[in-house]
């Protein structure tokens, strides 16, 4: 069985383990695509890895084993997660980048959180955490076991948070649904990921 591994942030480890695989690297920039194709050809691995210059949101869902998204900017991370879920990915490794979308929605701050958000830097970090907490919770509601880790030291990049998901197919706990609904109601936000996976969320939480 061939492992299908789209890298949504752009194999060697799995290849050294003798595991047949196909890798798809997605990056909107044609320059990145052309450079990576040349590198793959130089390394002699072009038969098992391909690169595309496309928007993540425009990629057709396909059967996938592992999805990796590295520093896809703002809602491009949500595009990557949504694509992975709709492609039935079994493992997710998501390292988000900037979080502008939810930050722009934080206008009616619930008390006493204005004590935090009145400071621009702290509001930015709060929106980062809120965005990724909601992403993780949405994945839980869709049958993934999720944890959030630091995948590299802060001296290399401040964007060192990773959301890891393993698909279990478990039905969402009623308390998890309640917590999610309470969180978006309290902050008066509409997560981009929830909009992209609206049908899946309705099906999962009302079944």
Language-model features and meaning:
Residues 19-27:
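Conserved SAM-binding motif I beta-strand of class I
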Residues 3-19:
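Conserved SAM-binding loop of SAM-dependent methyltransferases across substrates and taxa
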Residues 1-4, 98-100:
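Short glycine-enriched loops at secondary-structure junctions
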Residues 28-207:
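Class I S-adenosyl-L-methionine
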């Amino acid at each position: 069985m061939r492992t299908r591994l789209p890298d949504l942030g752009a194999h060697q480890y799995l290849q050294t383990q003798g595991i047949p695989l196909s890798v798809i690297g997605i990056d909107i920039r044609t320059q990145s695509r052309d450079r990576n194709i040349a590198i793959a050809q130089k390394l002699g691995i072009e038969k098992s890895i391909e690169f595309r210059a496309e928007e993540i949101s425009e990629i057709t869902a396909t059967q996938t084993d592992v999805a990796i998204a590295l520093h896809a900017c703002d809602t491009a991370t949500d595009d990557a997660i949504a694509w992975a879920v709709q492609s039935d990915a079994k493992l997710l490794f998501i390292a988000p980048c900037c979080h502008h979308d939810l930050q722009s929605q934080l206008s009616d701050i619930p008390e006493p959180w204005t004590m935090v958000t009145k400071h621009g830097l702290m509001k930015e970090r709060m929106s980062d955490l809120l965005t990724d907490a909601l992403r993780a919770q949405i994945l839980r509601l869709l049958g993934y076991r999720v944890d959030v880790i630091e995948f590299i030291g802060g001296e290399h990049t401040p964007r060192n948070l990773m959301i890891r998901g393993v698909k279990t197919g478990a039905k969402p706990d009623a308390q998890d649904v309640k917590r999610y609904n309470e969180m978006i109601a309290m902050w008066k936000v509409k997560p981009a990921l929830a909009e992209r996976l609206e049908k899946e969320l309705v099906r999962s939480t009302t079944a």
